[in-house]
Amino acid sequence: MTEQRAGSPAGNDLRSCAVIDLDAVRTSVTALVARAGDAATMAVVKADGYGHGMIPCARAALEGGATWLGTAFLEEALALRAAGFTVPVLSWLAAPGESFAAAIAADVDLSASAGWALEEAAAAARRTGRTARVHLKADTGLGRAGATEADWPALCDAGAALEAEGVIEVIGVWSHFAFADAPGHPTVQGQIGRFRDAIDIATKAGLHPSVRHLANSAATLVSPEAHFDLVRPGVSVYGLSPGPEIGPPAAFGLRPAMTLTTHAALTKRVPAGTGVSYAHRYTTTRETTLAVVPLGYADGIPRSATNTAEVLFGGRRRRIAGTVCMDQFVLDVGDDQVAAGDEVLLFGPGDRGEPTADDWAAALGTINYEIVSRVGARVPRRYV
């Protein structure tokens, strides 16, 4: 099955494609569920399933054993409901004035980090005549969303009052790690301790949440003391390790699901001293063959991959030669026998010797999350 995303031209499968192995998603989620032990597993499918396609990957994740789905934005959660998913869905990032009523009507769980979110959820619940399912979020050390230690008691008290009124039900208490991908970092145990304190404060306020959740991919894999009632793996749903300090995917039974492939658009012989691409950041040192590859930064290939990242072409890894352009980049293939139409593998699981998303991340000084999630709308996803 090939999915044409908004902005992708029909019929360009031969040119470029992100092949998504849904069995790899199922296999990886099954491994995560096993790691979670008695805790339930929420598959995080935000950002269009980290670039892999939210709907097909959500379905595969549930087949692999997940029982919850998680999104950042309300429209993502509503799209899951529109696609027929009935499992619990948590959406956690909204601004004042967003359509909480639509979310409540669709049985989407909401997150509240501040009083305004509780008030808007309660107001929407009164309008719809339905009880809002809410997860209170504590900032235990990430310094991002979540109520601070000083504000947490008041948030719990407000939640308890609205629960007593019958307009909300506090389903969960949750937080998020700052350094879970560095399991020896002292903040990890510190955040677990502060999360336990936050749960105690919620209990003293009269709340009895059924799910307490803290663990992301890294904590799901290596910090069982952080599992509580529910774990929330994200990048590892798609077979990727959350960081080099955690270990390679295979160490945990994970398999990378995305392979980004295209085909050379042109090959040509050029003399020594030929400047290549914008600003001539690469110059040939001898007579050689150049290959033009029809993917660029508009497709999610970072411009910083200029003269840095490698691809597999003609049976060998080759470094990008010169500036990555909006729609294309160039390879210097020397005297090797290649032709227009030959396959170019940018990254994948590594089975054929191609670079992995981890290789690209290391070369570019970023994380594998960014490499896969930025693959653009012009690149069709083909599901296998």
From Swiss-Prot:
Gene Ontology BP terms: D-alanine biosynthetic process; peptidoglycan biosynthetic process
Cellular component, GO, one term: cytosol
PROSITE patterns xrefs: ALANINE_RACEMASE
NCBIfam families: alr (TIGR00492)
Encoding gene, per UniProt annotation: alr
Active site location: 46 (proton acceptor), 278 (proton acceptor)
GO molecular function: alanine racemase activity; pyridoxal phosphate binding
Record Gene3D superfamilies: Alanine racemase, Lyase, Ornithine Decarboxylase, Chain A, domain 1
Catalytic reaction equation(s): L-alanine = D-alanine
Identification of the protein by name: Alanine racemase
Pathway: Amino-acid biosynthesis; D-alanine biosynthesis; D-alanine from L-alanine: step 1/1
Lineage of producing organism: Bacteria, Bacillati, Actinomycetota, Actinomycetes, Frankiales
Swiss-Prot/TrEMBL keywords: Isomerase, Pyridoxal phosphate
PTM sites of type N6-(pyridoxal phosphate)lysine: 46
Record's function text: Catalyzes the interconversion of L-alanine and D-alanine. May also act on other amino acids.
Biological source species: Frankia casuarinae (strain DSM 45818 / CECT 9043 / HFP020203 / CcI3)
Family that this chain belongs to: Belongs to the alanine racemase family.
Listed cofactors: pyridoxal 5'-phosphate
Residues holding substrate: 144, 326
InterPro entries membership: Ala_racemase, Ala_racemase/Decarboxylase_C, Ala_racemase_C, Ala_racemase_N, Ala_racemase_pyridoxalP-BS, PLP-binding_barrel
CDD domains (alphabetical): PLPDE_III_AR
EC nos: 5.1.1.1
